[in-house]
């Protein structure tokens, strides 16, 4: 038997214990069952569940060898943002500086900016060290990457050329200046240079982030064969193909025959044939009938409203802007975004001095903040009934957890990128269906799925 190691209960161990209890509930094991099957004492199992003891790697190894679980199921996300907001100073960013060479010459200087273990941001400050004399997309000085798995929003500072390839492999160049922005989908090959004659090297804030496909989803896909996993990618190249792909996918899940489908919908076989050959797209009312017949929601059968480019470029003068809130503490400039990621929002925000103490900002998204101005700002916030105040100096960056009330005060300019992470969208809908009254157990399980003493209530 392994020697018991006692730990002072902390938030990580408590959450880890709740996670372990959730695993036992899912596979219908009582603590005594787990102790018996894992060959340890019931005291050790209860100590892990109560957050008094860390689960050991050797115990996890035993568990994955006898139960249908994976090692990663036992490890929880570390919360390095216990106050709700994490700040990285410009001095700390400078300490992370590293020069990346391409084709044997210095090409980029990279610096880290604010990142948290609780959020999918991977934002970088990148200085373009390569200068070009023209705007030719075929310029041999431009050294291309292979694209990457992360979505990327980029904010431009200075005179920067942004090179990218379209889906057909054709090279393009966009002439970018301060305040311009862009979004690219994963695996889009691209690169950046400084235009010759610029007073200083161009700079980008390359805010890369994972959305729904990273983490557990990617792991689930990787456990399938390439052929099977690839079939999850439907044809969304245009509205018609997307509509048909969704209809076919949910129809195949139902195992209905066309004849049975016709009876359920009261559509003729000819009408169904038109739907399945794209001769006709279902109207909204027809989609509701189809959804009812397939026992799904109408939204499940609806393609995106727009089929947008994989590269979206937006100059600063194209940005819509407005004052917020009514008091006008901020002026928002709406930067590049895509409707394919409805929970990703990017803004340049002018902050106006205010003595108003109201925490006038709160959104249910992960937020990245960078002070792109020349003056210091103050950020105030409240988290778990505690009030905080910190300075955000030029070049400082921050991460803000979802639903944290906060404000910015002073006179300056900030960049904000908001993303949904894993919870927004279908996960949020599922949690809402489970009900707010059950969120505590859904977030972190605290009780066994049944009472051994019995219950008649």
From Swiss-Prot:
Residue intervals of the HTH cro/C1-type domain: 23-74, 247-301
Per UniProt, Fe cation binds at 148, 190
Top-level EC class as recorded in UniProt: oxidoreductase
DNA-binding region(s), residue ranges: 32-50, 258-277
GO terms of molecular function? DNA binding; DNA-binding transcription factor activity; ferrous iron binding; oxidoreductase activity, acting on single donors with incorporation of molecular oxygen, incorporation of two atoms of oxygen
* Protein family per UniProt: Belongs to the non-heme iron-dependent dioxygenase family.
Query: Which protein is depicted?
Result: Methylphosphonate synthase
Gene for this chain: mpnS
